[in-house]
Amino acid sequence: MVIRVDPERNEIRALKEVRTWRDKKVLEVGCGAGRLTLRLATLHPKSIHAIDPGADLIRTARKNLPTQFAKQIRYRVGSAEELKYPSNSFDITVFSWVL
């Protein structure tokens, strides 16, 4: 028997149950190539600032960014240790699959 699990689908389902995302400012730390970022965008936050230390991953995320989310999502190379945002800039912070 083979059971396939989509961890990102389960993750987004759990995140939807936790709180309202509409019109919230979101920081995603460890966004990788942006797969979860794009799913978060469907929850209608005001903005998503997605960071990852991998420059290649950020390039991929920017390349794959659909035009419908271009004004909503901002990708940046960076790490959790060196966040360059003022305090209280975000309503929600997401750390997913970050070690």
Tell where the protein language model's regions lie, with residue ranges.
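Class I SAM-dependent methyltransferase SAM/SAH-binding core
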Residues: 27, 35-82
